[in-house]
Amino acid sequence: MEIKRNKLTFEEYNRVFECIYGFMKKLEIPNIKKSMWKLEFMTSSKSDQIMVQRVSNRAEKLNENIIGGYTAVLPFYINYLSSARTEDALLRITEPLDILAKKFEEEMHNNFISISFPDDIVPQRLEMVVNPGSTTLENGMTVFTAMYQLTYYKKGAFE
């Protein structure tokens, strides 16, 4: 059976993405202060920050049904900028990204009770799909990036 793929609208992507971003900002993660969360852009290259970045060109509908319902995948990056001046700091730098993956897994097993999705969105999976890796190192600061993905069912017109 062939899988039919279509891109999500930017409006739907943002509507669902905002639910996930709001959930992440409320999480208690060691060494991550609420003020460190950024959306799309980091504001400094000298202080620790965690940034959520949309990947809208990879968000897509899978297998749309006759009444308009479909399964969708919504990928996003989380980038963590932190000091890498010591070997110990470098070893600990992926901890927040790994903790986020664990929190997402817990939320999934609890039927997404803490994330407020619109009524027509039925979340199925929220998981890390690409493990953290370093993307840059400059002036003792490094950025580690991991990719996560939400899979959900969008209800059709008569569901």
Language-model features and meaning:
Residues 35-47:
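Short acidic low-complexity segments
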Residues 1-36, 58-159:
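Charged, amphipathic alpha-helical segments and their flanking helix caps
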Residues 47-55:
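A short, hydrophobic beta-strand-centered structural micro-motif
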